[in-house]
Amino acid sequence: MLDPKHLRENFESVEQRLATRGGAVTLDRFRELDSRRRELLREAESLKAVRNAASEEISRIKDKSQAQPRIAEMREVSAKIKVLDDDLRGVDDDLQAVLLTIPNIPHQSVPVGASEADNREVRKWGEPPRFGFTPRPHWEIGEGLGILDFERGAKLTGARFTLYRGAGARLERALINFMLDLHTEKHGYEETLPPFMVNRESMTGTGQLPKFEEDLFHLDGTDYYLIPTAEVPVTNIHRGEILKGSDLPLSYTAYTPCFRKEAGSYGKDVRGLIRQHQFNKVELVKFTHPSTSYAELERLLANAEEVLRQLGLHYRVVELCTGDMGFSAAKTYDIEVWLPAQDTYREISSCSNFEDFQARRASIRFREDDKAKPEFAHTLNGSGLAVGRTLVAILENYQQEDGTVVIPEVLRPYMGGCSSIGR
C-alpha cells in the first residue's frame, strides 16, 4: 500500500510513474475521497473546538439554570459531530479499499516498458549444453523413465497435476533438501515451516487480495486460502509487529507446496511441469532497513543464482520493465534457466524489493532504539528456487542419448550416491 501522504503531496509524479505500468491505473477516486476526508476532519475539528470552549464556559457559570440553553446548544453540536465522525469512518473505509487496489510505484532504476519484450538482460552464466542428438522435452524424458506420470496425476485430480514416482519423487525431495541446506548453512537464512493455508488478512498483507482473488483457491465456508507461495505466510510472520532495528535484516527460507488456479493461462504450457495447479517451491524472504533494502536485493538474487551455479545449469538474469512487474513490487529481477528442448529461457525465480508497500498493508515496523518512532520496514522475497522447474531443467540439460539422465554431482549425496537415473 502506498503512503497516502506521499501520494497526496506528489500526486502528478506518482500518477505518471504508475502509468508506465500500463493498464487502467487511475488515482481520481483516491483524490476525491482524500479531499472529502480532509473536509470532514476540518468540520469535525472546528465543531469540537466550539464544544470544548463551551464546556469551559459552562463550567464557570455558577447558576446552572442559566447554563441550560448553552448545554442544549452543545447537545446539537455533539449530534453534528457524531454524524461527521460516522461519515469520516465510512470515507476512511472507502479510502483504505481504494489504496489496496493501487499498485506499487516502480523504482526509478526500473526500465520503462510495456511487456517482457522490454525487459533488460543483466547477465548470463554458463553455456548451453551441446547435444549430438535432438534433445527431448522433459515430459518425454520423465514418462520414458517412469518417473513422471501425467496420466495418473490427471486421473487423481485433473489437468495440471502430476504424479512423481520412484527416482522422480526422490529427485524432487533431493532438490528441496539441497536448496534448504544451501540457504540455511551457507547463506544464513532461518528455516521456517509455515501453514499451507492462511487467512484473508495474510493474503491482503502481501498484496494477493483483493486484486487477485480469482487465481486463489479458497476453502468454502472459511476465511482460509491455500497459499500461492510461501511469500504469503512467511512475510506475515511479523504482521502487526514492531521489530528491533538492530535485528535487521531478518532472513527466512521455507519449503512449501504452492497452489494456483492459473486463471488466464488456458492453452499455455499444457504439457509437462512448467505450469501446474500444485507445485513445490523454496522461498527466500527478507525484512530490512529501508537504507539497505536494495543491497539486500542484490544479495538475495545472488543466493538464488548460486543454486543454479552449483547445479551447473546455464541461466540469465533479466531486470523486469515497468509493464511486466508484479502488483506489489518496486523492482524485480527474474532468473531464467535454459531449457534446450524448448530452445529458450524460462523463469525459475523472481526476486523483488517491495520497499514498504507490503509492510504498510501488514503493519510491519521497526524501531532504531527504544525511544525512536516506529518506521515501516522494507520486505523482499524471491524463489530459491521453484523446485519443479529446476527438476525440468535437470532432465532436459543432463539428458543422455540413451534416455538416461545424469544427476548433478551436488545432488548425489541426497540421492543415496546415485549418479544417474535410468529405466
UniProtKB/Swiss-Prot annotation:
What the entry lists under Pfam families is as follows: Seryl_tRNA_N, tRNA-synt_2b
Q: Where in the cell is it found?
A: Cytoplasm
Residues that coordinate or bind ATP: 260-262, 347-350
Q: Which GO terms describe its cellular component?
A: cytoplasm
Q: Which residues bind L-serine?
A: 229-231, 283, 383
- Catalytic activity annotation: tRNA(Ser) + L-serine + ATP = L-seryl-tRNA(Ser) + AMP + diphosphate + H(+); tRNA(Sec) + L-serine + ATP = L-seryl-tRNA(Sec) + AMP + diphosphate + H(+)
Q: What is its EC number?
A: 6.1.1.11
Pathway where this protein functions = Aminoacyl-tRNA biosynthesis; selenocysteinyl-tRNA(Sec) biosynthesis; L-seryl-tRNA(Sec) from L-serine and tRNA(Sec): step 1/1
Which GO terms of type biological process are on file?
Answer: selenocysteine biosynthetic process; seryl-tRNA aminoacylation
Keyword annotations for this protein, in alphabetical order, are: Aminoacyl-tRNA synthetase, ATP-binding, Cytoplasm, Ligase, Nucleotide-binding, Protein biosynthesis
Catalytic EC class? ligase
Please list the GO terms describing molecular function. Answer: ATP binding; serine-tRNA ligase activity
Q: Which domain of life is it from?
A: Bacteria
CDD domains attached to this UniProt entry: SerRS_core
Which InterPro entries does this one have? Answer: aa-tRNA-synt_IIb (IPR002314), aa-tRNA-synth_II (IPR006195), aa-tRNA-synth_II/BPL/LPL (IPR045864), Ser-tRNA-ligase_type_1 (IPR002317), Ser-tRNA-synth_1_N (IPR015866), SerRS_1_N_sf (IPR042103), SerRS_core (IPR033729), tRNA-bd_arm (IPR010978)
List, alphabetically, the SUPFAM superfamilies matched: Class II aaRS and biotin synthetases, tRNA-binding arm
Q: NCBIfam families given for it?
A: serS (TIGR00414)
Task: Give the family from UniProt.
Answer: Belongs to the class-II aminoacyl-tRNA synthetase family. Type-1 seryl-tRNA synthetase subfamily.
Summarizing the function annotation, the protein's role is: Catalyzes the attachment of serine to tRNA(Ser). Is also able to aminoacylate tRNA(Sec) with serine, to form the misacylated tRNA L-seryl-tRNA(Sec), which will be further converted into selenocysteinyl-tRNA(Sec).
Q: Could you give the domain comment from the record?
A: Consists of two distinct domains, a catalytic core and a N-terminal extension that is involved in tRNA binding.
Q: How does it assemble?
A: Homodimer. The tRNA molecule binds across the dimer.
Name of the molecule in the record: Serine--tRNA ligase
Q: What is the lineage of its organism?
A: Bacteria, Pseudomonadati, Thermodesulfobacteriota, Desulfuromonadia, Geobacterales
